[in-house]
């Protein structure tokens, strides 16, 4: 470790110094840089070390856990010179005013004792989710299901506005991880499994959060922290914070792509993957942190660790012998701020490492510059706190946006015999553990880390309450109930199944609301992707009645239901639609609104067949000729991009501007979409490409564009896409981007057209 990981950073610097410097990802601002240098030259070593450390607010709490202890604040800021604080008091959301008052107290003391403003950070994930009076939107996985970037923009704008209103200038959002393993407990925090979808949605959210000028972030915007850089979402075991093994070409082509898009959009900070890639902990990976981002992108932003992950380098990963060695490893690899929640002596250790020469003064100053630059760009030196009136806080407009986003995100997966929509006079029986739970509708990062919406937001409707408000005859019996202890999300009480089945006998239709209770991060790890045995037993019991069952899936990841899906007449996946999700579902089931969501992930059918839509062509093979029974057929419950509507759409006239192209060309693609049904409807039009022959085994297809349109019955609209030829390139075995001569198939809505690349091009730059 000592002979390899630490010298790697120096090696990268040497290479970078000899290579042409790329244009900066964020253009430098002379006034910003002058301010940074003027502050830096006056700082002591201890002050510099303190700027690199971020502590949890719990270290400042008094015995009530609801207020700051002035003596503790004096020590943390006066003795340790700490530059950043994060999180919420008592591990629970507070009001905007309570949060603002707390941060004002910290800032006043920071300016008094250090002369440098503190920067406060919070995990705001799907809105102002750590404010009791804030606006919540559907989780990222739902926004991905809309295939409508406007909702990522709306959520980002509202989140920034309300967070800044609480004096918080930095959010740990958006989540950039690709949700490509359905076992992973954080899949719901992503926009889905596809890199292009993730990149488009995350870029919209980033720009909405930060605004258009990253050097001057206004008082209605906040700094983002792209997380978790990178490859975090595909742990080999499916368990959170465990190792990933990713080929380098896939790492750059798929996992880096969304980050690249957002770095180029001006993202000011990024949080690092808590685990490891190919045996190297990401927090010690100089190639990725310093090489791929700081050097190859000429990015002057800040890398912050995730929770206590410097400690994990020695406690868990065993690549360092102790805390000091771990600090040196991380900082020399490119970490600029250490989220060390409970240990202020981290500051002292950094001072010692600099004095011992194990962290160079140049690396220290570089990290401090990045921290100061962030604070200058946020205007914190001019206004550590601010008195702006936020008159649009929690405006009804934000609630309407959230409702609309939920409507467009909930996915109709099955509608046998057109059982949906339901007439309001139908006798409806509602059951299942998710029927009457706001906690389940919201998921994690909702008022509390593990989710606790019922405690904080009783004014919103659960699924049951929304159905009772919309339909005339609704009865309810849960059948299965969750243990509401925060860390016991998998525990269920199934003693009420027989009672629920008996109560359903008089109904015309049964709505069974199943799925998961809320969880977040490692506590969400599990050993079986199947929907729980108790919930399946409930559905099987209900099926004996011969009544039509509408299965509502309220879950953060696609739990396997292949054995009970045939028992259901309709299936709706609402995922985690948040506070307005119950009302959205009622509007959809009644026909007041139309379904238009599509799955942003592949819904697997079998436990040993967890595929993504862009699998390799060699993974799907029919039986080979002869005696060798080669069975490798893709069989999923529902594919990526699947979703039904109450109307129907026909695609025609798929055309491309040229049947032959070169590397510098832009292909113009058009397709006609017609609403052939009797209802107004929205349709997400998805464009794919397939490379038919390549020097590496190609993916069967890749998403290259999408657009959401609304059509009246009988209306036809021509959807246009511009597809740069470079978008069809892939990363070869040598790590270089390449577009190879040969045939490609472009497809959309079941139609296909062939085009030919007439030349091969290999790029020498790492990013195109």
Question: What are the roles of these predicted feature ranges?
Answer:
Residues 16-731, 741-752, 763, 768:
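Glycoside hydrolase catalytic-domain context in secreted enzymes
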Residues 737-738:
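Surface-exposed, short loops/turns at beta-strand junctions within beta-sandwich domains
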Residues 1-25:
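Bacterial Sec-dependent N-terminal signal peptides
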Residues 753-759:
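Edge beta-strands of extracellular beta-sandwich domains
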């Amino acid at each position: 470790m000592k002979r390899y990981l630490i010298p790697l950073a120096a090696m990268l610097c040497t290479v970078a110094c000899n290579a042409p410097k790329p244009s900066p990802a964020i253009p430098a601002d002379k006034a910003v840089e002058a301010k940074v240098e003027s502050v830096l030259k006056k700082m002591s070593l201890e002050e510099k070390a303190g700027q690199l450390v971020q502590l949890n607010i719990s270290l400042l709490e008094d015995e009530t856990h609801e207020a700051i202890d002035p003596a503790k604040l004096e020590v943390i800021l006066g003795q340790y010179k700490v530059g950043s604080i994060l999180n919420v008091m008592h591990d629970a959301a507070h009001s905007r005013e309570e949060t603002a008052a707390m941060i004002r107290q910290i800032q006043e003391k920071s300016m008094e004792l250090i002369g440098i403003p503190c920067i406060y950070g919070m995990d705001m994930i799907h809105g102002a989710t750590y404010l009791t009076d804030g606006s919540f939107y559907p989780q990222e996985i739902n926004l991905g299901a809309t295939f409508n970037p406007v909702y990522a923009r709306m959520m980002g704008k509202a989140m920034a506005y309300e967070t800044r209103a609480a004096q918080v200038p930095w959010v740990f959002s958006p989540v950039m991880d690709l949700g490509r393993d359905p076992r992973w407990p954080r899949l719901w925090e992503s926009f889905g499994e596809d890199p292009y979808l993730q990149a488009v949605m995350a870029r919209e959210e980033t720009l909405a959060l930060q605004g258009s000028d990253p050097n001057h972030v206004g008082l209605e915007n906040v700094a983002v922290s792209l997380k978790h850089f990178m490859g975090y979402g595909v742990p080999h075991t499916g368990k959170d914070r465990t190792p990933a093994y990713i080929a380098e070409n896939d790492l750059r082509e798929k996992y880096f792509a969304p980050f690249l898009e957002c770095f180029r959009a001006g993202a000011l900070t990024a949080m690092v993957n808590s685990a490891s890639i190919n045996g190297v902990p990401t927090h010690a990976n100089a190639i990725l942190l310093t090489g791929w981002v700081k050097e190859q992108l000429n990015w002057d932003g800040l890398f912050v660790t995730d929770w206590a992950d410097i400690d994990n380098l020695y406690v868990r990963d065993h690549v360092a012998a102790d805390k000091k060695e771990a600090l040196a490893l991380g900082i020399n690899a490119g970490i600029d701020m250490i989220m060390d929640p409970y240990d202020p002596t981290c500051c002292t250790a950094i001072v010692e490492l600099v004095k011992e020469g194990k962290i160079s003064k140049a690396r220290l100053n570089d990290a401090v510059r990045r921290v100061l630059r962030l604070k200058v760009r946020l205007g914190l030196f001019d206004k550590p706190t601010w008195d702006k009136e936020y008159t649009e806080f929690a405006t009804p407009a934000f609630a309407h946006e959230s409702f609309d986003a939920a409507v467009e995100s909930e996915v109709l997966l099955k509608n046998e015999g057109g059982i949906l929509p339901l007439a309001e006079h139908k006798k409806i029986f509602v059951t299942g553990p998710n029927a009457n739970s706001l906690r389940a509708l919201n998921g994690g990062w909702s008022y509390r880390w593990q989710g606790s919406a019922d405690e904080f937001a009783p004014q919103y409707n659960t699924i049951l309450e929304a159905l009772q408000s919309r339909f005339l005859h609704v009865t309810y019996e849960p059948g299965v109930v969750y243990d509401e202890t925060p860390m016991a999300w998998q525990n269920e009480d199934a003693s009420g199944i027989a009672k629920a089945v008996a109560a359903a006998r008089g109904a015309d239709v049964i709505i069974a609301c199943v799925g998961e209770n809320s969880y977040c991060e490692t506590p969400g790890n599990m050993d079986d992707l199947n929907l729980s045995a108790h919930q399946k037993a409930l559905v099987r019991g209900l099926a004996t009645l011969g009544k039509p069952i509408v299965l509502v899936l309220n879950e953060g990841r696609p739990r396997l239901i292949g054995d009970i899906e045939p028992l259901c007449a309709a299936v709706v996946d609402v995922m985690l639609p948040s506070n307005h999700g119950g009302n959205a579902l009622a509007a959809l089931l009644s026909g007041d609104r139309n379904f238009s969501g599509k799955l942003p992930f592949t819904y697997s059918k079998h436990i040993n067949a967890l595929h993504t839509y862009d699998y390799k062509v060699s993974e799907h093979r029919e039986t080979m000729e002869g005696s060798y029974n080669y069975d490798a057929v893709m069989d999923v419950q529902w594919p990526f991009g699947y979703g039904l509507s109450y109307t129907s759409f026909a695609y025609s006239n798929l055309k491309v501007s040229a049947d032959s192209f070169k590397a510098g060309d832009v292909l113009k693609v058009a397709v006609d979409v017609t609403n052939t049904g009797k209802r107004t409807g929205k349709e997400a039009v998805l464009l794919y490409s397939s490379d038919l022959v390549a020097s590496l085994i190609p993916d069967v297809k890749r998403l290259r564009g999408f657009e959401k349109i609304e059509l009246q019955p009988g209306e036809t609209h021509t959807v246009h896409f511009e597809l740069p030829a470079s978008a069809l390139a892939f990363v070869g075995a040598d790590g270089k981007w390449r577009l190879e001569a040969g045939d490609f198939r472009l497809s959309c809505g079941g139609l296909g057209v062939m085009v030919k690349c007439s030349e091969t091009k290999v790029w020498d730059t790492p990013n195109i």
